[in-house]
Amino acid sequence: GYEVDVEKIFDLNMDRIESVTILKDASATAIYGSRAANGVVVVTTKAPQEGQLRVSYNLNVAISAPDLSDYHLLNAREKLEAEVAGGLYESEYMDTQQKLRMDYADRLKRVKSGVDTYWLSQPLEVAVGHKHSLYVEGGDKSIRYGIDLNYQANPGVMKKSSRDRFGVGFLLSYNLNNKLLFRNKLTVDKVKSKESPYGSFRDYAAANPYERVHDDEGKLIESYDTHVATTARYLNPLYEATLNHKDETAYTSWTDNFDFDWFINDHFRLKAKVAYSERTD
């Protein structure tokens, strides 16, 4: 076998997996060396079957929905009452006190008018991902081959976030009278990831429910007053998503694994492996 990162396991076609074995402690160390002292997860994929040419296609659809049940936040009225109880609208300075009272009156007016923004849901959506896999296999007792084409589209629950992957794999094995066995597997993957422009989710958890998302004209409000009686303001996290910025990652990886087995006799076996990988961003 060959050592791969977790991302490779995540991208595996589940229909191509034959078995999963967990090795611990001494057994893992004996086979894979000191790096496996804490254990190894061995994933065995299905070998190409001999016989007539076979073509298989699989489609997997995954639906991801955000779970906000662990968030227990105050509604607009409760948040305003908590701020009053905490003394946020009290000051020993007359000018500051007047400004704080005006802020409180404005927020109370909004609460009474029905403003109660549930900010947690604003940057989220139900994401529907799909995975396509086309596999071609065939051969005879001596030569077997397998060709794998796959495409994954994985949108995130944060709006406009995604991870898309296209991969090609080619496996060729040659068995000479059950004495010599050659195997070579070449895989090429192209991955593109996009982070959500809607920023950090904690900004939405910290936003005040008595603030509106849009003004009376339906335009997105850019910023809001802070809790203190100053000119300081904080940005509407939804407004940041309208700014022209991107956070994307794209790379192409090449991996070629070659192994050789020579069954000298019933007691001796010679095995060699060569692996090469390259990644370009």
Protein language model features and the residues they cover:
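Residues embedded in well-ordered regular secondary structure
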Residues: G1-E3, G39, A47-K159, P197-S200, ...
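Short acidic/polar hinge/loop motifs at secondary-structure boundaries
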Residues: G1-K24
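Non-catalytic, largely sequence-independent nucleic-acid-binding elements associated
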Residues: D5, D225-H227
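Short beta-alpha junctions and helix-cap segments that line functional grooves
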Residues: D5-K8, S27-I31, V41
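Conserved catalytic network of the ASCE P-loop NTPase/AAA+ motor domain
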Residues: L12, S34-R35
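Transmembrane beta-barrel strand/turn architecture of Gram-negative outer membrane proteins
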Residues: R16-E18, A36-I63, S142-D215, H245-D281
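GHKL/Bergerat-fold ATPase module in large chromosome/replication-associated machines
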Residues: I221-S223
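Glycine-rich phosphate/dinucleotide-binding loop and adjoining beta-alpha-beta core of small-molecule
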Residues: A229-T231
